[in-house]
Amino acid sequence: MTSASITNTGNETMNLPQMRSIWLDEDEEAEKLYGLQAQQFMGSDDEENLGITFINSDKPVLSNKKNIELPPLSPNSHPSCHHRRSNSNSAKSKESSSSSSSANKTNHKKVFLKLNLLKKKLLGAQPDIRGKGISTPFDFQHISHADTRNGFQDEQLQEPSSLSTEIKDDYTSSSSKRDSKSLNKAFVTERIPANRESKLISRSHENKTSRLSVARSISVTSSNYSKNTQGNNHSINGRVVSTSTMATSIFEYSPNASPKQFKNKSHALGHRYTNSTDSSESSLDFLKNYNFPTLLEDKPILDFLPRSQRSSAYRSLLETPNSNKDSAKAFFPSRQSPLPKRRNSIATPSPQSKFSYSDSPVNHRKSFDDVLYSFNQLEPLQT
């Protein structure tokens, strides 16, 4: 924003100071300016009235449009006026001193020259204040943004050089000492030194745990590194070795290994239940010895017996109950609750089934409680 005005005060013309720029630092001030533009284009609302009067050259607001009287400016507000007044005063003094003798003139000139030389030596060359100074009309306070470029430019210039040196040091040097600048970033962890890593590799070869590739699992390396640091430094603040990190090791992959080698390793481990290496035989033996969880359907239990034993079982069931007590006990023992009775078990009722499988017809649908009760009855026969 630039503005200039000239006023006639008597016979002399005085240039008012110019307001060259306004920097808004606060967001609220910027919102006021945007809201002021919205009021001009859309109309003002009583609720959101900002209370700002905008003075425009097209629509003057002041009543007195000509010969505006202004208070006299202080000499500090505008250095150019003070400079002109001092020049005029010096000119008047020169005119008055012309009547004096020539010896006094030469003496005064010599004194002024000596004073100027001393000022230049002590203060140096003074820059032009008019070009760089900010005008302050009517005690206006200049608002400017905080200059953050000076603080961040040095860091931006130093970052690429420091990064390049750090990368070279990681691959060339084996020392663990680093500059403090490299650790001024978030999520930075120190790399395992090369000499300690070589010791870990030699120890792993001695314990017959050779690695297949350089890319080891993170859990094993972290646990081994913590062991090494605790053993060498004996520090209280050392890392605590946890069993969870040591137990998460997996098969390591190497680019030179073929898929046949992995198959041979899996076959050499053997089956989980049998020690045989043949996968087909182990699966058959596992299926033969495995007890599948069965759920009884509408068919009676005797249908699960072999065909040669079904006829004898049916005949024994069709006989009279008095003559077939022993056979009935063999297949269906006495109805008792599977839960053991206690002395103080009056308040806990025991589950009782209404009928057994021998009394029920063939096509009768059983409930789940009856199926559980039948399994509890047949448990002694299986053992």
From Swiss-Prot:
Residues 87-105 have a biased composition (Low complexity). GO terms for molecular function: phosphatidylinositol-4,5-bisphosphate binding; small GTPase binding. Residues 166-182 have a biased composition (Basic and acidic residues). InterPro entries: CRIB_dom. GO terms for biological process: Cdc42 protein signal transduction; establishment of cell polarity; positive regulation of formin-nucleated actin cable assembly; regulation of cell shape; regulation of exit from mitosis; septin ring organization. The modification Phosphoserine is found at S254, S258, S337, S345, S367. Residues 63-106, 155-189, 319-361 are annotated as: Disordered. GO terms for cellular component: cell cortex; cellular bud neck; cellular bud tip; cytoskeleton; incipient cellular bud site; mating projection tip; plasma membrane. Disulfide bonds: none annotated. Residues 134-147 form the CRIB domain. Residues 155-165, 345-361 have a biased composition (Polar residues). Interacts with GTP-bound CDC42. Belongs to the BORG/CEP family. Required for cell size and shape control, bud site selection, bud emergence, actin cytoskeletal organization, mitotic spindle orientation/positioning, and mating projection formation in response to mating pheromone. This is GTPase-interacting component 2. It comes from Saccharomyces cerevisiae (strain ATCC 204508 / S288c).
